[in-house]
From Swiss-Prot:
The keyword Oxidoreductase applies. This is Bifunctional protein FolD. Homodimer. The lineage of its organism: Bacteria, Bacillati, Bacillota, Bacilli, Lactobacillales. Gene3D superfamilies: Leucine Dehydrogenase, chain A, domain 1 (3.40.50.10860), NAD(P)-binding Rossmann-like Domain (3.40.50.720). Pathway: One-carbon metabolism; tetrahydrofolate interconversion. InterPro entries: Aminoacid_DH-like_N_sf (IPR046346), NAD(P)-bd_dom_sf (IPR036291), THF_DH/CycHdrlase (IPR000672), THF_DH/CycHdrlase_cat_dom (IPR020630), THF_DH/CycHdrlase_CS (IPR020867), THF_DH/CycHdrlase_NAD-bd_dom (IPR020631). Catalyzes the oxidation of 5,10-methylenetetrahydrofolate to 5,10-methenyltetrahydrofolate and then the hydrolysis of 5,10-methenyltetrahydrofolate to 10-formyltetrahydrofolate. It catalyses: (6R)-5,10-methylene-5,6,7,8-tetrahydrofolate + NADP(+) = (6R)-5,10-methenyltetrahydrofolate + NADPH; (6R)-5,10-methenyltetrahydrofolate + H2O = (6R)-10-formyltetrahydrofolate + H(+). It comes from Lacticaseibacillus casei (strain BL23) (Lactobacillus casei). One of its GO terms (biological process) is methionine biosynthetic process.
Length: 283
């Protein structure tokens, strides 16, 4: 039976360590500061932002919320980003996605100062990642790597298959895996013989947002399975992209949904906010 990779326990440890680091930074008059820009009133975004603020408050990160109305123009949003870029007291900027229709997300991402880009979405951050240079990366991939590390799962030399090619998970995770000496394949909706490809993976990452997309017939015995997806079934129950009940008996390790990758994402956001604050403190 697979070991369950407990993201709640690992993230709790990360946050406790960060709280200690933040207390030490405070002795040097440094307070990690995260600016969150929320445009409109998307219910899911409201929940995500509230969770981020709660975690920030718990560990001593200063979290500033900038709410903008649904009717915000592109020019007004870019002006707010520019204002935050030039504020010397702000270490990290996060514009909560998705943005309302009519706003150009990529233009907004491009406008964020790469040295404050805590999401790691800017072209400069992406370039640094693929050049294997120190950089901030998207929180979910960062969290996945931290979770694997916590369980001493070494990716070097492993065959990694990532199903999903989003800029939020699949692509940046591929970069991190390559930088840690894994052999990586990204699969997607146009990939042929997807199940056979998945079954060749030593580490299988699934991020497609389709409940129980992967079953036992697509997993190699002994594989590590990372389930990034989260959906609600007809009964309201949270479901992952992987059928855990079917896959757990043959995998060596698996992330549960909920309680696997999800908690690691916010912990990673906090960790990288602290990293950016340290850079500011060190000039």
């Amino acid at each position: 039976m697979a070991t369950r990779l407990d993201g709640r326990a690992v993230s709790k440890k990360i946050l406790a360590d960060l709280k200690q680091t933040i207390a030490e930074l405070a002795q040097h008059d440094v307070t990690p500061t995260l600016a969150v820009v929320l445009v409109g009133s998307n219910p899911a975004s409201e929940v995500y932002v509230r969770n981020k603020q709660r975690r920030a408050e718990d560990i001593g990160v200063r979290s500033l919320m900038f709410r903008m109305p649904e009717a915000t123009t592109q020019a007004d949003l870019l002006a707010k980003v520019a204002e935050l870029n030039h504020d010397p007291d702000i270490d990290a900027i996060l514009v909560q996605l998705p943005l309302p229709a009519g706003l150009d997300e990529q233009a907004v991402i491009d406008a964020i100062d790469p040295d404050k880009d805590v999401d790691g979405f800017s072209p400069v951050s992406v370039g640094r990642l693929w050049a294997n240079e120190p950089t901030v990366v998207a929180s979910t991939p960062y969290g996945i790597m931290a979770l694997l590390d916590a369980y001493d799962i070494d990716v070097a030399g492993k065959r990694v298959v990532i199903i999903g090619r989003s800029n939020i998970v699949g692509r940046p995770l591929a970069g991190l895996m390559v930088n840690h000496d894994a052999t990586v394949t990204i699969a997607h909706s146009k990939t042929r013989d997807l199940k056979q490809l998945a079954k060749e993976a030593d580490i299988l990452v699934v991020a497609v947002g389709v409940p129980h997309f992967i079953g036992a017939d697509a997993v190699k015995p002994g594989a590590v399975v990372i389930d990034v997806g989260i959906s609600r079934g007809a009964d309201g129950k949270l479901l992952g992209d992987v059928d855990e009940a079917a896959v757990a008996p043959i995998a060596s390790a698996i992330t549960p949904v909920p309680g696997g990758v999800g908690p690691m994402t916010i912990a990673s956001l906090m960790a990288q906010t602290v990293t950016l604050a340290k850079r500011r403190a060190n000039g």
